[in-house]
């Protein structure tokens, strides 16, 4: 699978580093060191990143990226059935297990590091890097379940019960149980049936929530590109900070649903109505948390003047300020909550043979309320 995107970035003059390492300090010329006036080296180039650079992007440029996907999914299922009868009660037992394996062997999002995609304006100094899908571990999902179906004949009345439980395990993530029960009983045989159900469904996260991209930030420590310095003496110094956005406390989303219904049959007419409620308090979302705010030292430099007479030599720097700077990013969370209530109905008034016409009325009503269990954050400017 392959997709392609191209756009123009405007007001894009912002710092960008090619480094993938937290704490790396690069200049705009690969491997070139930058020093303070006392000879202390400002740049910190990680091993293996000697050919990388950090620079100021132009105010406007065309960027493009490709997304290469090569999905691989496997599925296996094993089921066995047992049936029997005890007096007026018919039993049917179902036991089974299934296994799912899913992942992607593609190259993922690929772009020219000289022209990276437009940054996220919602986060100061935010940046992004290439990441291959094949570097993301495969998801292994195992499920084991059991279900018992009972049919009990009580004279002309019939009681049907189906009860089951399922255990799900996502390797490297977590597990949980999801029980459910469905029942129906004839109040008036062949005319009125009462139905009810209750169940819990566990939803495993996708790979996006299990293995999110790291949060990259490129802080511009020095930039004299807009000064009168000769081109050979214009340079930038940029510090890269990298944070793991994975949430180790993420858990399976739990959905609780119950319903109650009536089935009415009279002559050729049939009326079905069902009321239901669905509730979830830990659905998946991506948002900020108390742990995704990071205070980092932000060092700023200025040039030592006069500049070297050799225009191929850059000036040394001096530190003018070091202040704490609050960076923030998002992480997968169980913060989504919602409540759904509704009614479904289907009224079949039967066929009127005299005019060869059948009348049917069906519809539904749904009410939904959603919100977040997360804290609300905002910047207070004084």
What do the predicted segments below correspond to?
Residues 1, 7-14, 48-51, 62-63, ...:
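Surface-exposed extracellular loop regions of Gram-negative outer-membrane beta-barrel proteins
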Residues 6-13, 106-112, 173-179, 207-212, ...:
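Outer-membrane beta-barrel translocator domains and adjoining extracellular loop/strand segments
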Residues 15-159, 210, 318-320, 336, ...:
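Outer-membrane beta-barrel transmembrane domain signature of Gram-negative proteins
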